[in-house]
């Protein structure tokens, strides 16, 4: 399943986040796959698409960052799947 993970960087934490990433990498467990991400120009948020079959894997991954990042996790589907799902209701 796909998830939009919105990372809310804690105040002043952006340098710490990037330093930790350089030293330790993403720290996602096997089965939690990173697809892509975008960071706001003010370094306050990151919008990240992750793919995994077990939501608990995301919790495990987020626990590695929860001291400097607050997370919002939203299950998502592709536009193609959304179009197919809504078609019978049109």
Label each region the model flagged.
Residues 1-35, 39-45, 53-57, 77-90:
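Short S/T/G/P-rich N-terminal loop/turn motif that feeds into the first structured element of a domain
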Residues 49:
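Small, basic N-terminal interaction modules of short regulatory proteins
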Residues 62:
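Short, flexible helix/strand-to-coil boundary loops that buttress conserved ligand/catalytic motifs
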Residues 68-79:
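Conserved short beta-strand edge segments in small beta-sheet-based binding/regulatory domains
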């Amino acid at each position: 399943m796909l998830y939009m993970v919105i990372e809310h960087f804690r105040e002043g934490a952006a340098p710490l986040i990037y330093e930790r990433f350089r030293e330790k990498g993403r720290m996602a467990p096997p089965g939690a796959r990173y697809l892509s991400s975008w960071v706001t120009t003010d370094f306050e948020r990151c919008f990240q698409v992750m793919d995994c079959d077990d939501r608990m894997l995301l919790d495990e991954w987020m626990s590695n960052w929860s001291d400097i990042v607050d997370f919002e996790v939203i299950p998502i589907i592709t536009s193609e799947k959304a179009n197919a799902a809504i078609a019978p209701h049109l």
